[in-house]
């Protein structure tokens, strides 16, 4: 699933798809020889962002994850039968896409994300959403993306532990108070703020003020706070 509004050119997209197909074809030959294929075929119906959030919790239940943080999402997805290819590129117009070829669920992510683990984890969770969510065909591209974004955030930051760490409803945010949340869930500061807004812990004004400050401080290129 490539995002239709991606800034990636058609030729660049096709090159990535071809490279990925070659990689997965070779990968599957090796698995055929070793008779080691695990098929990932989990689908959960949803038609709204609220149902997408519930689908994330349902998948956590199916995988016996409780509400604990996801320590290694890439390894978890591979253990469940999703094939992952890290495509070597510095082109930040591409972050990832997912597809199913010959019943094999596949995710391709950009190698530049390895320098930004919180972003990499959110991209993986977003592509997991596209593989898992069984959405109505008449939903718009934006609605598909909104559902995938909410699923990804809920999967990485379940409501109960997140709300407790965030401290309930807030009318101000201190950046340093978000660092423990970033470290615990392995997500970026903007992802935390968007999740807090989604859960009605902060309002529109506070969300907007945060992003103005975040951009002004240049945190998009060099975000403070450790991710462990």
Predicted regions and their residues:
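Active-site hotspot residues in diverse enzymes, especially metal/ion-binding acidic/histidine motifs
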Residues: 1-228
């Amino acid at each position: 699933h490539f995002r239709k509004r991606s800034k990636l050119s058609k030729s660049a997209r096709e090159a990535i798809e071809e490279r990925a197909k070659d990689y997965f074809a070779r990968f599957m030959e090796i698995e055929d020889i070793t008779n080691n294929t695990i098929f990932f075929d989990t689908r959960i119906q949803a038609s709204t962002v609220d149902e997408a959030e519930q689908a994330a919790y349902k998948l956590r239940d199916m995988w016996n994850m409780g509400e604990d943080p996801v320590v290694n999402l890439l390894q978890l997805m591979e253990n469940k039968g999703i094939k992952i290819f890290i495509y070597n590129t510095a082109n930040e117009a591409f972050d990832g896409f997912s597809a199913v070829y010959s019943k094999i669920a596949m995710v391709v992510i950009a190698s530049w994300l390895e320098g930004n683990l919180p972003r990499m984890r959110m991209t993986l969770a977003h592509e997991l959403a596209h593989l898992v969510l069984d959405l109505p065909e008449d939903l718009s591209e934006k609605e598909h993306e909104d559902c995938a974004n909410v699923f990804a955030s809920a999967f990485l930051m379940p409501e109960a532990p997140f709300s407790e760490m965030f401290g309930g409803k807030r009318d101000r945010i201190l950046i340093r108070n978000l660092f423990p949340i970033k470290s615990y869930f392995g997500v970026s500061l903007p992802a935390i703020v968007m999740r807090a807004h989604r859960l009605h812990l902060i309002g529109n004004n506070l969300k907007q003020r945060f992003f103005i400050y975040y951009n002004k401080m240049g945190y998009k290129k060099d975000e403070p706070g450790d991710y462990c």
